[in-house]
Regions:
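Contiguous beta-strand/loop segments that form the cofactor/metal-binding neighborhood of enzyme cores
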Residues: 56, 60-147, 180-193, 228-230
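Predominantly a Rossmann-like dinucleotide-binding segment in NAD(P)-dependent oxidoreductases
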Residues: 3, 8-88, 94-97, 220
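Short amphipathic beta-strand/extended segments with alternating polar/hydrophobic composition
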Residues: 107-110, 138-142, 158, 162-174
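C-terminal helix-rich "cap/oligomerization" subdomain common to oxidoreductases
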Residues: 150, 185-230
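Active-site loop of classical SDR/Rossmann-like NAD(P)-dependent oxidoreductases
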Residues: 171-183
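Short, hydrophobic secondary-structure boundary micro-motifs
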Residues: 4, 29, 75, 108, ...
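Short polybasic amphipathic segments
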Residues: 129, 145-163
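Short acidic, glycine/proline-rich loop/turn micro-motifs
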Residues: 44-48, 120, 169-170
Length: 230
């Protein structure tokens, strides 16, 4: 049994967003965004790879889009280097658009520069997401890059007929509580003999989306997911 630790799926805010999509609260999704302004801690082993953000950070956001909405038809990605990251790399800052057959567009900005927050300027760091549906709106803040990193994520949502936004809260946070979910899905699969919630076959589609993003950035064109995942 092979289960994959795509742990952003188990962030409490991301799970709540999925619930609103599944139960129809916000209706058909029209536009979704993830906006990351964060400064990752790159590991020494990454310095020899020539890449950083798409395979380390963006993969979580692409997988979250897949978790929320399923597989897109294509992706367009644009990247540039991060001025703060001194070792050779191509994808320091990334932006990409996932195009769905329904017309839905899922857009992400993964900004690892965030302005000179480490060089003397005040910091404005955070990860925000937003889903606009035909019947409602949901938006959230991911606590991972806050100080402390155990800050709980948040969600705020409202639908047609509501007089105000709803803002449920919880004490858990992505780190470390989301990892309970990824470990539990493996244990459930071992107990039942069923495919894990995030199995290897499913994760290949996320990996294909990342590879399609690299190809898109290299060739300056939209890349069909079917070009990579056959």
């Amino acid at each position: 049994v092979l289960a994959v630790n795509q742990n952003m799926r188990y962030d409490q805010s991301v799970r709540a967003g999925k619930t609103l999509l599944t139960n129809g609260t916000i209706g058909e999704p029209i536009l979704a965004t993830i906006d990351m302004r964060g400064i990752p801690h790159w590991m020494p082993w990454q310095e020899r790879q020539g890449w950083v953000t798409l395979r380390i950070m963006s993969i979580h956001h692409m997988d979250t889009f897949r978790y929320w909405f399923g597989d897109p038809e294509r992706i367009y990605c644009s990247v540039r280097t991060d001025p703060r990251t001194q070792f050779p790399h191509t994808d320091g800052i990334a932006s990409y658009i996932l195009e769905y057959a329904s017309g839905l567009r899922a857009i992400a900005v993964d900004d690892t520069w965030t302005g000179p927050a480490r060089e003397g300027a005040p910091a404005d760091i955070g990860i925000e997401w937003r889903i606009e549906g035909l019947d409602g709106l949901a938006k959230g803040n991911i606590g991972w890059c806050q100080d402390p990193y155990t800050t709980p994520s948040t969600i705020t949502y409202a639908a047609k007929g509501d007089s105000e936004f709803h803002s449920p809260t919880w004490p858990e946070s992505w780190f470390p509580d989301a990892f309970i979910g990824t470990m539990a899905q493996l244990l459930i699969a071992l107990e039942t003999g069923e495919e894990p919630a995030i199995g290897a076959r499913d994760n290949l589609k996320t990996m294909a989306l990342v590879e399609a993003a690299y190809l898109s950035a290299k060739e300056h064109r939209a890349v069909e997911l079917s070009e990579i995942h056959k």
